[in-house]
Amino acid sequence: MGLITAAGASISSVLGDQWKEYFYCSEMDTNVLVRKGQKNNGKSGLLNRGGSENVITNGSTIVVNEGQCMIIVDQGAIVDVCAEPGAYTYDTSTEPSVFTGGLGAGLAASFEQFKARFTYGGVTAHDQRIYYFNTKDIIGNKYGTANPVPFRVVDKNIGLDVDIAIRCFGEYAYRLSDPILFYKNICGNVNTDYTQDRIENQLRTELLTALQPAFGKISEMGIRYSSVVNHTTDLAIALNEVLSDSWGAKYGIVFTAFGISSL
């Protein structure tokens, strides 16, 4: 009975995968960092419920919009990446299409795939996924120093060199600069969306930890405490330097803006 059930599932699954599909991701909200691409039926524009969920049919169209980066994952490994807006055709023999390259060849390939699926309970032996990454600036991230942060005030003209304690509150922005690093080290395979709140606390904690050395860098530039609000760009650059090892080299994130609402 198990073989009969597997055979029935395999036939339905393989034939469902033969319809050419397209993958498209509409504009993502600012709180969405990663979204799994959904398979749409090429004929009706509806989600294809007949094919295997994690199979990309040969000849399928993949659309990449502005502010997005797309990666294709096959068996857990990244096999393609595209950050250029446009429509692309998926061209590989991993899952041959009945409607591409002649009915006979496609049917024969489907049959070979059908035989392989018996050992997987009617599910394709391949696991292919498309992920879309939001590469726009993620803005409006709030921060605030719970405890005062030391700030060194140096003025060589008058021989001043003292430490004061300051608090600051505001918002910052960041951007996914390397989606491959973000996928490998942060999000991995996700079923639907990977949202900002899942990493927000970690980023805020690291940002607040980096504030002290960043303040140290701008104080060395001779910037006074009262003028810090006029040098937020310099502070953002200093924060990027401090956070480059964790955010840049590990997370694939670049710090883009730092705003101070009160100091």
Residue ranges and their predicted role:
Residues 1-263:
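N-terminal hydrophobic membrane-entry segments
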